């Protein structure tokens, strides 16, 4: 568990944090440049020293301004991956990985190297590596120090699109197989969507929102980053069954299910899906003989007028689903809170 209760001056603003983060999964730190994202993880790592408050990791006090406690970075058991890999140019990859390696990680070396796909790189110098390869090595080096927490400061920011696509699957694999909590700084919605379990949104050094990805994603806090045409719902689902004849997979959403193209995932595997609001249409009665495979019973929570369109908030299996319809459709269907209807979903994308 990471307990953050501190403040630190940032130019004209003050970074003020009072949150407790669980000791698992990835928490994305999101916001515009200058919001305080990097300053937050620098304070956690010990690169900077807050003027007030405390930082506590798994019961160990890293910072306590009133008591004058400030552990040096090497004593914090916190790994840090920067935007630029910062590898030692005169060491081969193997030497970079072993630099600072904890004795407790010696037996894990081969497993971690395989997990990151860097075994073919072990005898190469950093100068011969691509940007994505360098970052994989940097992540491996940080993990081999046996940290209790891993900080990643926009690790994909300096990479071109092909290299980002190369690295994302490795990061997704790490979240599933390495039981180390991570703080992932980013201003990329795509990275957050594919990696984060939770999101903390910072603005001018203040926490504007903090919670599960699916909750924060659907909140008004994200409106500045999500154009209305990109309004969507993020939902947690599990694999229910596979239909081999039609090559389809059913995903459980509460006591209902969604069909998607066949997935190579075991039954009960947990996944996250994204449904665009523009891909959801509403009907009052269950349609007959329709080509749309996904028709879900839903209850209207509320509706909001927005520049000639209507955003309808629905509840499906205890989850929030958004639909975008016209004012004409709203009036004709008599949309109001508490109304039960059917949501027809034209498209579903898997995010994680």
Swiss-Prot record:
Q: What is this protein called?
A: Molybdenum import ATP-binding protein ModC
Q: Where is the Mop domain?
A: 289-352
Keywords of the record, alphabetical order, are:
ATP-binding, Cell inner membrane, Cell membrane, Membrane, Molybdenum, Nucleotide-binding, Translocase, Transport
Cite the Pfam families for this sequence: ABC_tran, TOBE
Q: Name one GO cellular component term.
A: ATP-binding cassette (ABC) transporter complex, substrate-binding subunit-containing
Write out the catalysed reaction: molybdate(out) + ATP + H2O = molybdate(in) + ADP + phosphate + H(+)
Q: Kindly state the subunit structure of this protein.
A: The complex is composed of two ATP-binding proteins (ModC), two transmembrane proteins (ModB) and a solute-binding protein (ModA).
- Name the PROSITE patterns on file: ABC_TRANSPORTER_1, ABC_TRANSPORTER_2, MODC, MOP
Source organism (scientific name): Escherichia coli (strain K12)
- The encoding gene: modC
Q: What does this protein do?
A: Part of the ABC transporter complex ModABC involved in molybdenum import. Responsible for energy coupling to the transport system.
**Span of domain ABC transporter:** 1-229
UniProt subcellular location:
Cell inner membrane
SMART domains registered for this protein in UniProt: AAA
Write the Enzyme Commission number(s) for this entry: 7.3.2.5
What is one process in the GO biological process aspect for this record? tungstate ion transport
Instruction: Give the record's membrane topology.
Output: Peripheral membrane protein
Task: Note the PANTHER family from the entry.
Answer: ABC TRANSPORTER I FAMILY MEMBER 10
Q: Which domain of life is it from?
A: Bacteria
Tell me which residues bind ATP. 31-38
Q: Which GO terms describe its molecular function?
A: ABC-type molybdate transporter activity; ATP binding; ATP hydrolysis activity; molybdate ion transmembrane transporter activity
């Amino acid at each position: 568990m990471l307990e953050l209760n501190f403040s630190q001056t940032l130019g004209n603003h003050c970074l003020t944090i009072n949150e407790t983060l669980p000791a698992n999964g990835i928490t994305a730190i999101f916001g515009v440049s200058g919001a305080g994202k990097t300053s937050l993880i620098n304070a956690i790592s010990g690169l900077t020293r807050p003027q007030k408050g405390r930082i506590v990791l798994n019961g160990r006090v890293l910072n306590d301004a009133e008591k004058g406690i400030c552990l040096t970075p090497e004593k914090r058991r916190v790994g840090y991956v920067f935007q630029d890999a910062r590898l030692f140019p005169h060491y081969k990859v193997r030497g970079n990985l072993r630099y600072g390696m904890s004795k407790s990680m010696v037996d894990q070396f081969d497993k971690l190297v395989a997990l990151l796909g860097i075994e073919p790189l072990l005898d190469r110098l950093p100068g011969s590596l691509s940007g994505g390869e360098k970052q994989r090595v940097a992540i491996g080096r940080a993990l081999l120090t046996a940290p209790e927490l891993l900080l990643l400061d926009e690790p994909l920011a300096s990479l071109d699109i092909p290299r980002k696509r190369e690295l994302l699957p490795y990061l997704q694999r790490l979240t599933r197989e390495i039981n180390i909590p991570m703080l992932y700084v980013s201003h990329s919605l795509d990275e957050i969507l594919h990696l984060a379990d939770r999101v903390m949104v910072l603005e001018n050094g203040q926490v504007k929102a903090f919670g599960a990805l699916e909750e924060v994603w659907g909140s008004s806090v994200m409106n500045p980053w999500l154009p209305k045409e990109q309004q969507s719902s993020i939902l947690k689902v599990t694999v229910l069954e596979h239909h081999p004849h039609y090559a389809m997979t059913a995903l459980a959403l509460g006591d209902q299910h969604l069909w998607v193209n066949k997935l190579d995932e075991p039954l009960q595997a947990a996944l996250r899906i994204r449904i665009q609001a523009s891909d959801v249409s509403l009907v009052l009665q269950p349609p007959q003989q329709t080509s749309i495979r996904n028709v879900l019973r839903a209850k209207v929570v509320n509706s909001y007028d927005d520049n000639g369109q209507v955003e309808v908030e629905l509840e499906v299996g205890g989850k929030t689903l958004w639909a975008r319809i016209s004012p004409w459709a709203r009036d004709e269907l008599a949309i109001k809170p508490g109304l039960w209807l059917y949501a027809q979903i034209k498209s579903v994308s898997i995010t994680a």
